Amino acid sequence: MIALIGNLSRDLKPGRPPFVGGGPFHGARALQRLRVPARIVARCAGADREALLPPLVRLGTPVRYVPGDATPTFGIAYDGDRREMRVEELGDTWAPSDLPPLPPIGWAHVAPLSRHEFPAETLAALARRCRVSLDGQGLTRVPEVGALRLDANFDPEILRHIWTLKLANEEAEVVGDPAALGVREVIVTHGSRGATLYTRGTRTDVHAHRIDTDPTGAGDAFMAAYVVARNAGFNALGATRRATAVVAAVLARG
């Protein structure tokens, strides 16, 4: 069994009402296709629960709701695969005590929306239960309201507690050489074009057929599929290939 853990977001795009986002939601879109044992641990402000939680629950994976005080809110616009974002509100920070009891799990993917959400001590507590993968947003996104900024001023202690790190292209540019981070598996995703895996001193490109559609959540769907494959016994390269194919199917479905 695997778990997806993170804050739900309230996303704003031109020409449409606010809608649910965040790693738990977009990862659940992949889990809906894979139909494997999994749990989702999701958090948002109590005032937003009725708006944000039902769309997640409808995707079919059992959900554990963690009450929160704030809901991360983003304004989002795309130019092809290039995303422009504005932070309207920051979400809650998770303490170790916020991690609920779960059935035995082999892997958990943690999907922060900003650097402050999952500090090293919380990841350390989770790593005592299972292998942990982390979205690079939890390293590079500066926790402030306004135009989204990235920098490399993260706590390096975080890297000690994770097995796999997923970076988008722009995050990889900020942190530097992925192979030098000291993480067992680093995956750099390239939007709809595939991914690059760094592991055991090797670099492997995994290509995908480009799909002209909104790529929001592609990285979250990728990592949900990746940890499912790793938990099922795939090696890192096999899991990367599997996740690339799953993301293509999820994006094609819309």
What does each of the following model-derived ranges do?
Residues 7-8, 221:
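Active-site metal-binding loops of divalent metal-dependent hydrolases
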Residues 10-18, 33-111, 116, 122-131:
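Conserved N-terminal subdomain of the carbohydrate kinase-like
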Residues 28-37, 229-231:
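Alpha-helix C-terminal capping segments
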Residues 29, 74-77, 194-198:
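Short beta-strand scaffold segments in enzyme catalytic cores
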Residues 40, 163-164, 185:
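Well-ordered beta-strand positions
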Residues 107-179:
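Conserved beta-alpha-beta core of the PfkB/ribokinase-like small-molecule kinase fold
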Residues 177-254:
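Conserved phosphate-binding/catalytic region of the ribokinase-like
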